[in-house]
């Protein structure tokens, strides 16, 4: 029996579906430029740049003002609240700069994590209060999609059933609110790479978490064709003594997704989870070469793995703008190829792109 309660109209569904498909068009992924002020401070510290608003604006201006060819491999950019209202050097609001290239504008809407009592330092994510009003305003201000990150971890007994259920429910509630306000929700249940667990343990946890997430999305009547998933790849823990090949990581990842993610989801945009730039690209490429049916687009939603070499090239100096943009475009193009399984590593990746970007208990 169909329910007679308020739900999305056919027009709303079509708009959401069209937005999601634009973001993950063939060869395209997402630039996650939604790092908080504190996280940007840590990045700037590494290159001895002061964490002030003008420097943050300056770096993001360099990324966003890259020539229009960037739109061939970047379909969407996730903004931080501050960035949404900043302007480029020539006086245009950043969302306008990005939209003129044909790139979809997104916004991070969660308010960070809070501890779950009675668990082993597990968390839920805050920010549901007032979310509908914020989403309505963001839609008016040019956003067409949103992102919300939940964090889970693998250790003895973790993730707890409570943490899985709570985070799945929070993600579903967020997704429902976004869709009612015309925003495509990116659903991000990240399992942190902290720990010494092996590939199989991560695959098992990933399957349990994703199964719970899609059950919750169904319970909340979320329109799956108008959503995107941003999961972790299935990788061994950062301290795992055993090494696994990109093909093993890819097979475990695709197997977990095939068991849990409905085919109606248009795209799965992986987070990089502290992998080096090159590693994140190689793994994405291998995932798109797995000899199994993959009904969704499998692409990237990278922050560190798209920006690390660019930051190193910039060093806070205006004179380095062209070099920074060149490094950024090169990395974005590599990931665009990887999202089609067409990246052929030359074996001569520079040192910056091979450096691990791992941070324990990573806070975005």
Curated annotation (Swiss-Prot):
Gene name linked to the record: aldob
Single Gene Ontology BP annotation: glycolytic process
GO cellular component terms listed in the entry, alphabetical order: centriolar satellite; cytoplasm
Known partners and oligomeric status: Homotetramer.
Subcellular location: Cytoplasm, Cytoskeleton, Microtubule organizing center, Centrosome, Centriolar satellite
InterPro entries named among the record's database cross-references: Aldolase_I_AS (IPR029768), Aldolase_TIM (IPR013785), FBA_I (IPR000741)
Binding site for substrate: 56, 147
Active site (record annotation): 188, 230
Positions bearing the site annotation: Necessary for preference for fructose 1,6-bisphosphate over fructose 1-phosphate: 364
Organism: Sparus aurata
Stated name of the protein: Fructose-bisphosphate aldolase B
Source lineage: Eukaryota, Metazoa, Chordata, Craniata, Vertebrata
Family, similarity comment: Belongs to the class I fructose-bisphosphate aldolase family.
Keywords: Cytoplasm, Cytoskeleton, Glycolysis, Lyase, Schiff base
Record field: catalytic activity: beta-D-fructose 1,6-bisphosphate = D-glyceraldehyde 3-phosphate + dihydroxyacetone phosphate
EC assignment: 4.1.2.13
Root EC class: lyase
Record-annotated membrane-spanning stretches: none
Pfam families from the UniProt entry: Glycolytic
SUPFAM superfamilies noted in UniProt: Aldolase (SSF51569)
Pathways per UniProt: Carbohydrate degradation; glycolysis; D-glyceraldehyde 3-phosphate and glycerone phosphate from D-glucose: step 4/4
């Amino acid at each position: 029996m169909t329910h007679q309660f308020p739900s999305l109209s056919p027009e709303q569904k079509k708009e959401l579906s069209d937005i999601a498909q634009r973001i993950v068009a063939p060869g395209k992924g997402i630039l996650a430029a939604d790092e908080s002020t504190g996280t940007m401070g840590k990045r700037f510290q590494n290159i001895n740049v002061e964490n002030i608003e003008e420097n943050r604006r300056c770096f993001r201006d360099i990324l966003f003002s890259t020539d229009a060819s960037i739109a061939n491999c970047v379909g969407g950019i996730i903004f931080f609240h501050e960035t949404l209202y900043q302007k480029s050097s020539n006086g245009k609001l950043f969302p306008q700069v990005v939209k003129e290239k044909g790139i979809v504008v997104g916004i991070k809407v969660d308010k960070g994590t809070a501890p779950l009592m009675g668990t082993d330092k597990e968390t839920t994510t805050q920010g549901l209060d007032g979310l509908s009003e914020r989403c309505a305003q963001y839609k008016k201000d040019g956003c067409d999609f949103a992102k919300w990150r939940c964090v889970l971890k693998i250790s003895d007994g973790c993730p707890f059933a409570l943490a899985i259920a709570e985070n799945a429910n929070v993600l579903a509630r967020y997704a429902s609110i976004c869709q009612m306000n015309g925003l495509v929700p990116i659903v991000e249940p990240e399992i942190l790479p902290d720990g010494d667990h092996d590939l199989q343990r991560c695959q098992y946890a990933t399957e349990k978490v994703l199964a719970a997430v899609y059950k919750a999305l169904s319970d909340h009547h979320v329109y799956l064709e108008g959503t995107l998933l941003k999961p972790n790849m299935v990788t061994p823990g950062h301290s795992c003594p055993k090494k696994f090949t990109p093909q093993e990581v890819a097979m475990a990842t695709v197997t977990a997704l095939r068991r849990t993610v409905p085919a109606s989801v248009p795209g799965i945009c992986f987070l990089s989870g502290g992998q080096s730039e090159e590693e994140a690209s190689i793994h994405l490429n291998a995932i798109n070469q797995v000899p199994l049916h993959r009904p969704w687009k499998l692409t990237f939603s990278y922050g560190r793995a798209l920006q690390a070499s660019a930051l190193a090239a910039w060093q806070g100096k205006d004179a380095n703008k062209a070099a920074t943009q060149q490094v950024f475009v090169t990395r974005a193009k590599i990931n665009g190829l990887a999202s089609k399984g067409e990246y052929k590593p030359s074996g001569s990746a520079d040192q910056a792109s091979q450096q691990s970007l791992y941070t324990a208990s990573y806070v975005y």
